[in-house]
Structures are given as C-alpha cells and as structure tokens.
Amino acid sequence: MNQDTICAIATAQGGAIGSIRVSGPEAITITGRIFTPAKSGKLLSEQKPYTLTFGRIYNGEEMIDEVLVSLFRAPHSYTGEDSTEITCHGSSYILQQVMQLLIKNGCRMAQPGEYTQRAFLNGKMDLSQAEAVADLIASSSAATHRLALSQMRGGFSKELTTLREKLLNFTSMIELELDFSEEDVEFADRSALRRLADEIEEVIARLANSFSVGNVIKNGVPVAIIGETNAGKSTLLNVLLNEDKAIVSDIHGTTRDVIEDTVNIGGITFRFIDTAGIRETSDTIESLGIERTFQKLDQAEIVLWMIDSADAISQLTLLSDKILPRCEHKQLILVFNKVELINETQKNELASQFSEHIGSEIESIFISAKQRLHTDELQQRLVAAAHLPTVTQNDVIVTNIRHYEALTRALDAIHRVQEGLDANISGDFLSQDIRECIFHLSDIAGEVTNDMVLQNIFAHFCIGK
C-alpha cells in the first residue's frame, strides 16, 4: 500500500480556498508534471523542502488555476513520505480538475485516514497519537481540544513508555533468576519487586480511572430532562439547544421517544436527553417511551426534574417514591417551569413545601422555558453541577474506550502479579502475567495491533486526513 502515491482533497467544500494533499514516493514527480512554477528555471523537484512555490496547474495547454505548492521531503513530513500540498481556489470544479490530473498522472485516491495511517506505519506517531488526531478534528470544547492535543503531542505515549520500561525491567529480573535458579542467585528480593508492582499498579489504575472523567468530557455530560407530560421538557430542550429540535404541543404524550443532542455551555459539552412524559397510560408505544425515560434517568449524571408550577404539589409522591431513590448518586435539580402562571407568594409556598417534603439539600430553580425566564441561570447551575476538573494540555486523561479496555486488562494482569508475589509463586508464572501486562499496554500504542483493528480505527477518519 505504501508504494502507491495517494491524493485527496483536505478541505471542506464551499471555502474560498481548497487544499489537495499528495503523499508517496512519486508525490513530487507527479505534482511536477501538472505544475509549472511562475518563475522559470527551477522545476518543482529542484525546490528546497519546506518552501511554497507559486505557479499554475495545466491540463495540456489549458490553465486550470493559479496555485501555491508546499513541498516536504521524507522523512520530514506528516506521513514520513515525500509530500506536496496544492492550495488552489475553492471551486469544486477546480478541485475536481486537479484531482483528475493527479490520478491521470499516477496517483490513486486516498482511503479515509490513510495519511495518518501512513504516519503511524512510518513511525511518525504511535496509534494512540494517531487516534488523537481524529479527536482533535472532532473536538467541540476547550477541554476536548486540550485532551486531544496532549495525547497527540505524546503525553499518554510517554506514560505508556515509562510503564513498559519498568515492566521489562521487572520481568528481566524475574527471568534472570529463572536462568540462574540452580545457582541460588537472587537478583531482587520479593519485597522490592512488590514495591515495583505497587508503583506500576498505581499508575495503570490512575489512567484507567481517568476514563470516567475523560469519557464525559469527550461525549458530553449526560443530562436527562424528566417529568410528567406537558411539564415543558421539549420546550426547555429547544431553548438549551437554541433550535427547534423537539415537537412542542399542548397534547399530553407528544414526546414518545428519546431525543438527544449536544451543546457547549461554558466550555463544557452537555448531552441533553428529552424523554417521554411520565404518566399512567394504556398506549403501548407511549409506555415503551416511559420505560426508556427511566433507563435514561439511570444513565444520566445530571437529572432535571421538570415541574409544572401550576400543578406542582400533585407530583410530590411521584418525586419521592420513584425519582429520588434513582438519583442518590446524581445531581438532581428541580426545575419549576411556567413560573409566569403563579405569583410570588405561591412560589415561596412551593419552595417551602418541597423543601420540607424532600429536604432542603435538593437544588431547585423557577423558570419559564416558553418566555426564556431564568434559563441563563439554569445553564450556570448545570456548569456548576458538572463538577468537571480544569483540564490543561499537560493532563493525561483517557478518553478512548479501546485504551480503557486495554488498561483494565493490564490492571488485571498486574493484580495477579501482586497476588503471586504475596503467595510466593514461581517466577515463571509471574513472568507470564508481567508479559501479559506489557502486551496490553503495547496494544494501546499499536505495537501488537492486527491489521483488521488498524483498518477499523483509520476508517473513521476523513478522506483528507
């Protein structure tokens, strides 16, 4: 595959300029066949690397466009191969004409993620760094951007390298003892090995445990909007998303299925989940929707219990019997909606009665989703309730489920090593578990990953990356 020279459009359609990437052993030669520098003299192949050359793309005698060509020589390029980048005007016609000329002269169309895959195969980055490229492209908040950038720059890779070096040192001491078992030579006492195992276990556990935070940062804090029918859940969702995502109607039971979408508030990505209203119903479809409501409630980090302020007292039993027990370890906010329908005295009475019945520690807020009253304050409450740590580019937080699974397997293996040391088992059994731990950590970096897994990972990239 790496013997082919590939090309692809690297920019989105509709922009003022467009960019085409060419990479492979014939990248400079093929680009030079269709490109003529504006200044006569040097051919493209004679230009210095890391330079921009102004000129024109020709199809025979016909000029296609005036362009800039960037030149990179192996191994000092993104892919580690000879590469060019052609920057032209953003017309889709021009871009397609240039692509056709490149393919006609020996290029083939790149597969999704093939540029980054080549960078990985050519040793420009490990697999975790390659995956971070996709995360950086998809980042939608300051936190996801910082985490992806940290991983792409090798923060996670350095942690893995240090762990593998310690484990290799560990297993070498064990296996040396096995080699000299007949001579009764001890290269490291068991207490020293146990301390080393504890040190390794602590780092792996920290990385694995960081996934609970990393996953929320990457995919959004799940917020379930729950309540009885016609409490204003769909109206609130539309306000929070600033678009008409959900159908709003006075008819009870309008929302029958779960509606989800994400939005960035205060630098944090929230995943809002609008659910079917809870009520007694004989409608089979609506009942299934209510079932899903409780499923989503269980999966949420934050629960907004929507209450129609004009009919709030009737919900106390449902709230205390069915909702509170499910929210013991969640952030629950009571959202009294339609506040325009009650006066200040009624508002104070409601707050007092709910506080007396369910406890004053439950947070509450009065809003009008329809009139957008106090919805800004609700957003501020959501940011505070998220409890996400401040993320810097130096933080190593796991956001990828593949990495998390490998870390948990590595953690299981090092736990067996600790148990084996305590039980004073034979060194050959310890060595097997240490090597298994190394295997799972190496899998994250792509050192032992099979071709099918690689193909699946890079297939999720865009064509030009």
UniProtKB/Swiss-Prot annotation:
It is found in: Cytoplasm. GO terms for cellular component: cytosol. (6S)-5-formyl-5,6,7,8-tetrahydrofolate binds at R21, E85, K124, K465. CDD domains: trmE, TrmE_N. Keywords: Cytoplasm, GTP-binding, Hydrolase, Magnesium, Metal-binding, Nucleotide-binding, Potassium, tRNA processing. Its cofactor is K(+). SUPFAM superfamilies: P-loop containing nucleoside triphosphate hydrolases. K(+) binds at N230, S249, I251, T254. The keyword Metal-binding applies. It holds the Pfam family TrmE_N. Binds 1 potassium ion per subunit. Residues 220-387 form the TrmE-type G domain. PROSITE patterns: G_TRME (PS51709). It comes from the Bacteria. It is an enzyme of class 3 (hydrolase). Disulfide bonds: none annotated. One of its GO terms (molecular function) is metal ion binding. GTP binds at residues 230-235, 249-255, 274-277. Its EC number is 3.6.-.-. Homodimer. Heterotetramer of two MnmE and two MnmG subunits. Belongs to the TRAFAC class TrmE-Era-EngA-EngB-Septin-like GTPase superfamily. TrmE GTPase family. This is tRNA modification GTPase MnmE.
